[in-house]
A protein has these predicted regions:
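Local beta-strand N-terminus motif with an aromatic residue
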Residues: 57, 81-85, 113
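Conserved Rossmann-fold cofactor-binding substructure of NAD(P)-dependent oxidoreductases
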Residues: 66-81
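Rossmann-fold cofactor-recognition segment
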Residues: 52-69
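Canonical Rossmann dinucleotide-binding motif of NAD(H)/NADP(H)-dependent dehydrogenases/reductases
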Residues: 2-38
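Amphipathic alpha-helical dimer-interface segment in Rossmann-like NAD(P)H-dependent oxidoreductases
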Residues: 76, 80, 93-94, 115-124
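Helix N-cap at the beta1-alpha1 junction of Rossmann-like dinucleotide-binding domains, i.e.
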Residues: 40-44
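Catalytic Tyr-X3-Lys loop
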Residues: 86, 101-124
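Rossmann-fold scaffold of SDR-type NAD(P)-dependent oxidoreductases
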Residues: 62-63, 83-101, 120
């Protein structure tokens, strides 16, 4: 029996086959997990749909993690397909463009730091 056989895992932050989330999704699937995926905005929907198919999943959810309402809606929608969640992969990293431009710390503002921390660390 595989290590994660029958476990239900939500993967966030998958954007390409070079994403850490992609490697984690591969390992989870190889070990028997069922996977669901999130994306943010219509711009990424088709890409994540294709990745989900690669992992034999049709569970994809639009979720802006800066919105508590969207996070709550995500779990409500996921609950329509799964009766529980065994794991969540938080692989989301973001900072405003101006916060990462130029030399180290040149573009970093208090607000930019708050946004980066909220999305990259606090969101779930």
């Amino acid at each position: 029996m595989a290590f994660l056989q029958g476990k239900k895992i939500l993967i966030t932050g998958l954007l390409s086959n070079r994403s850490i989330a992609y490697g984690i999704a591969q390992a989870c699937k190889r070990e028997g997990a069922e996977l669901a995926f999130t994306y943010v905005g219509e711009r990424f929907k088709d890409r994540i749909t294709d990745f989900a198919k690669e992992f034999d999943s049709n569970l994809i959810f639009d979720c802006d993690v800066t919105s508590d309402e969207q996070i709550n809606a995500l779990f409500a929608d996921l609950g329509k397909s799964w009766d529980h969640l065994d794991g969540l992969v938080h692989s989301i990293g973001f900072a405003p463009r101006e916060a990462i431009a130029g030399d180290f710390l040149d573009g970093l503002s208090r607000e930019g730091f708050k946004v980066a921390h909220d999305i990259s660390a606090y969101s779930f």
